[in-house]
C-alpha cells in the first residue's frame, strides 16, 4: 500500500470559464500541454455517510495514472493523506488493508457504493526554470450520480495540486484563477455528489451554554477517528494525538458529567480508559526509546561502557513491536467501534439544558481540585511525593481541558490560563519522566548485570536523572504562582 500527502485546492467557474495563463505565478515559467484522461470512480460509504461526515473518502477509480482504491483522510494544515491500493475486482469491495483503516470512521459497519463520479480530465504541469514540476492543474468536466437517491449533477472544476511547489504558489495560482472568474470550492466532488443526503444530517452542537462543551467533546471524538488510520500504521504523532483526544474526552465527560446520562457516561469513560491504555503502551515506549537514545549519545564516549545504546535499542524495538501489535488488535476488536457508536449516541443525543453559571462552576471545581492536589503534593517528599506530583499533573490536565471549553466564549483570558496550566503541566511532566526513566534504567541495568554486561553507564544515567529531578520543585512553585494570579483567573469568578 502506498501513502501520499496531497495539498490541493479546488475551484469552480461559470459556463464559459477558461483557464488563464498561469506563467509567472510563484516561479512558474512553463505550462505543459494538456494530457487527457477519463476517470470513473465509485465512492463507498456507510448508509449514514459516516466516512464523508468524518472527513474520509473511499473510492475505487479506473482510468488515469493512479487507478485503484484510494482512501483520503484529512491531515494537518489542510493537507490530505491518501492511502492507495491496487484496484482488484470491482465486485470484491475494499481490500482488507483499507477496511482496517476505516474501521473508526465506519464504526465497523459495512460500506457500500454511495456515489459514482465520471470525470473527463485535462491535466497540465506547472514547471519552473529548471523543468521541475511545481504543481499540476486539472480541468475536470464532472458528472456525478448519487447511487442511493439517483440524483445527478454536472459541473466544471479546476483542481490545483502541489508537487514541489509551496503554499505561496497555491496562493498565486488561486489569485490568478479568481481574477479569471473562478471561485474556490470548499468541498470535495464526493460531497457535492451526495449533497442532498448530507443536508439531512445536522452535526452542529446544540445552542446555549452546553454547546461549547458538547462541541469540544465531539472534536475529541472526531480526533480519535481522524487519527485512526495513521495510528493503526504506527505513526508516532497520530498515536500521540489519538491518545490525547481520548484523555481530553474522558476528562470532559467527568468534569461536565451532569450534561449526559451518568451511568452511560461512566461506562464510556471506562472504555476510553481502555483505549488510552493501549495507545499509551505504544506512545510511552516510543518516547522512552528516544529519550534514552539521546541520553546515551549525549555522554562522552569514555563514559559509555558496553553496548548500552545497542541493547536499549534492541529491547525497545521488541517492546514497541509488541505494543503496536496489541494496539492493532485493539483497533481490530469489536470493542473499539462499539465504543465509538456509544460515543455517538451520547454526544449526538440530547444534552441537559444548563446555564453558563453551571458550566463555570464545573470549571472552577476542576481548577480548585488541581490546586489542592498540587499543594498537598508539594508538602510530601520522596517517592510518595513523586506519586502525588503525578496525580496533581493529571488534575491540572483535567482543569486545562475544562478551561479550553470556554476559550471560544471567554477569549484571551481563558487562553492565557490554558497556556499557564500547560506550562505547569509540562514541568510536572518533566519530573514524572525522570521518575519513570529512573525505574526503566534500573530494570535494564538489572538485566544487563544478569547477562554479564557492565552497568556503569546505566547507573550514571540514573544519577543524572535524579540530579535533574532535584531542581524541579522551585520551577514548579514559580509556575504554580503564575497560574494563580488574579489577572488570569478573574474571568472565572464573574
Where are these predicted regions, by residue range?
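Function-determining surface determinants
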Residues: 1-494
Amino acid at each position: 500500500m502506498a501513502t501520499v500527502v496531497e495539498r490541493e485546492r479546488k475551484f469552480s467557474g461559470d459556463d464559459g470559464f477558461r483557464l488563464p495563463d498561469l506563467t509567472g505565478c510563484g516561479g512558474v515559467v512553463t505550462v505543459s500541454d494538456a494530457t487527457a484522461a477519463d476517470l470513473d470512480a465509485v465512492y463507498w460509504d456507510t448508509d449514514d455517510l459516516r466516512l464523508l461526515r468524518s472527513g474520509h473518502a473511499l473510492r475505487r477509480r479506473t482510468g488515469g495514472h493512479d487507478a485503484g482504491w484510494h482512501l483520503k483522510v484529512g491531515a494537518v494544515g489542510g493537507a490530505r493523506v491518501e492511502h492507495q491500493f491496487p484496484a482488484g475486482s470491482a465486485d470484491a469491495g475494499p481490500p482488507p488493508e483499507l477496511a482496517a483503516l476505516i474501521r473508526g470512521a465506519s464504526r465497523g459497519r459495512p460500506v457500500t457504493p454511495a456515489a459514482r463520479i465520471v470525470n473527463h480530465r485535462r491535466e497540465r504541469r506547472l514547471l519552473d526554470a529548471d523543468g521541475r514540476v511545481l504543481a499540476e492543474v486539472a480541468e475536470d468536466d464532472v458528472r456525478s450520480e448519487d447511487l442511493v437517491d439517483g440524483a445527478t449533477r454536472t459541473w466544471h472544476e479546476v483542481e490545483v495540486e502541489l508537487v514541489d511547489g509551496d503554499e505561496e504558489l497555491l496562493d498565486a495560482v488561486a489569485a490568478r484563477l479568481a481574477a479569471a472568474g473562478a471561485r474556490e470550492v470548499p468541498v470535495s466532488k464526493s460531497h457535492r455528489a451526495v449533497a442532498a443526503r448530507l443536508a439531512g444530517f445536522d452535526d452542529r452542537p446544540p445552542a446555549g451554554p452546553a454547546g461549547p462543551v458538547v462541541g469540544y467533546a465531539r472534536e475529541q471524538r472526531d480526533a480519535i477517528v481522524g487519527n485512526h488510520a495513521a495510528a493503526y500504521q504506527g505513526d508516532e504523532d497520530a498515536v500521540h494525538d489519538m491518545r490525547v483526544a481520548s484523555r481530553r474526552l474522558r476528562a470532559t465527560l467527568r468534569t461536565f458529567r451532569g450534561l449526559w446520562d451518568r451511568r452511560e457516561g461512566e461506562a464510556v469513560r471506562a472504555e476510553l480508559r481502555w483505549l488510552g491504555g493501549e495507545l499509551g503502551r505504544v506512545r510511552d515506549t516510543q518516547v522512552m526509546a528516544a529519550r534514552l537514545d539521546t541520553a546515551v549519545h549525549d555522554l562522552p564516549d569514555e563514559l559509555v561502557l558496553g553496548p548500552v545504546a545497542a541493547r536499549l535499542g534492541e529491547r525497545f524495538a521488541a517492546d514497541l513491536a509488541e505494543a503496536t501489535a496489541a494496539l492493532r488488535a485493539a483497533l481490530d476488536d469489536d470493542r473499539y467501534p462499539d465504543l465509538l457508536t456509544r460515543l455517538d449516541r451520547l454526544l449526538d443525543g440530547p444534552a441537559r439544558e444548563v446555564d453558563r453559571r453551571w458550566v463555570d462552576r464545573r470549571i472552577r471545581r476542576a481548577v480548585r481540585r488541581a490546586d489542592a492536589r498540587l499543594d498537598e503534593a508539594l508538602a510530601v517528599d520522596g517517592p510518595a511525593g513523586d506519586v502525588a506530583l503525578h496525580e496533581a499533573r493529571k488534575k491540572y490536565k483535567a482543569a486545562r481541558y475544562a478551561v479550553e471549553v470556554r476559550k471560544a466564549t471567554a477569549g484571551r483570558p481563558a487562553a492565557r490560563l490554558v497556556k499557564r496550566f500547560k506550562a505547569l503541566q509540562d514541568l510536572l511532566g518533566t519530573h514524572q519522566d525522570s521518575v519513570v526513566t529512573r525505574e526503566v534504567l534500573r530494570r535494564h541495568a538489572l538485566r544487563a548485570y544478569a547477562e554479564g554486561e557492565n552497568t556503569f553507564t546505566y547507573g550514571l544515567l540514573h544519577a543524572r536523572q535524579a540530579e535533574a529531578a532535584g531542581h524541579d520543585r522551585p520551577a514548579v512553585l514559580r509556575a504554580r504562582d503564575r497560574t494563580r494570579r488574579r489577572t488570569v483567573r478573574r474571568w472565572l469568578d464573574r
